[in-house]
Amino acid sequence: MVSAIVVAGGKGKRMGTVQSKQYLSLNGKPILYYTIKSFLDCKLVDNIILVVPSHEIDYCEKEILEKNSLKVNKIVAGGDERYDSVYNGLIEAKGSDIVLIHDGVRPFVSKETIENAIKYSEEYGAAAPGVMPKDTIKIIDDNRFSIDTPNRSHLISVQTPQAFKFDLIYDCHKKIKNENVNITDDTMVAEYFGNKVYIYPGEYTNIKITTPEDLIIGEYLVNR
């Protein structure tokens, strides 16, 4: 069984909005609508688990799912940190062979990217899409002076869905709760315990909508 965990616990801080960014409108539909529909449209995904803040569960059921005729298998309350939310989703995904973990504000993930996540995680145990940065990347010191320029050919901007054999990522998430480490995504959780993650080619259109500028790009993409 293949399960997709859609993590939709983001706030509107960088977006500058009161409303959580996953509920902002793109062409008359909430961002989260497009994200969920992407997984519903992929026949290889058997199970969809939506993780949202506990106080938003009722809103999400009525305003996102019911109003837009969407169905998920389970809505789960998130935790204080992102990895807590993912772990809550993983508990509901027990029995899965493969689990995909996806940002709720990446609405333009393609069917091909989802299918490749499944394929490569089955082969390698852990996989994620990524794209090469278009800009030169600098490492700066605390005073914002450039101190190094990494070789761009070895740099990747990692996206989601990040896919894993279930037992691998579940065991890692159970253990990471006892570690004092700053975790920003699930590939880091896997890598922290010595697992290799295969990075396959992603798509530049698979953007994470975080800022007002992203919303403008999103409006263009949804109307292509």
Swiss-Prot record:
Site (Transition state stabilizer): 14, 21
Keyword Transferase carried by entry: yes
Protein name as it appears in the record: 2-C-methyl-D-erythritol 4-phosphate cytidylyltransferase
Annotated pathway: Isoprenoid biosynthesis; isopentenyl diphosphate biosynthesis via DXP pathway; isopentenyl diphosphate from 1-deoxy-D-xylulose 5-phosphate: step 2/6
Coiled-coil annotated spans: none
Keyword Oxidoreductase: no
Gene from which this protein is expressed: ispD
Species of origin: Clostridium botulinum (strain Eklund 17B / Type B)
Function: Catalyzes the formation of 4-diphosphocytidyl-2-C-methyl-D-erythritol from CTP and 2-C-methyl-D-erythritol 4-phosphate (MEP).
One GO term (biological process): isopentenyl diphosphate biosynthetic process, methylerythritol 4-phosphate pathway
InterPro entries assigned to the protein according to its UniProt record, in alphabetical order: IspD (IPR001228), IspD/TarI (IPR034683), IspD/TarI_cytidylyltransf_bact (IPR050088), ISPD_synthase_CS (IPR018294), Nucleotide-diphossugar_trans (IPR029044)
PROSITE patterns: ISPD
Entry's family note: Belongs to the IspD/TarI cytidylyltransferase family. IspD subfamily.
UniProt entry keywords in alphabetical sequence: Isoprene biosynthesis, Nucleotidyltransferase, Transferase
Gene Ontology MF terms in the entry: 2-C-methyl-D-erythritol 4-phosphate cytidylyltransferase activity
Pfam families: IspD
EC number(s) reported in the record: 2.7.7.60
Reaction(s) this enzyme catalyzes, per UniProt: 2-C-methyl-D-erythritol 4-phosphate + CTP + H(+) = 4-CDP-2-C-methyl-D-erythritol + diphosphate
Database matches in SUPFAM superfamilies: Nucleotide-diphospho-sugar transferases (SSF53448)
Transmembrane segments: none
Annotated site residues (Positions MEP for the nucleophilic attack) in this chain: 152, 208
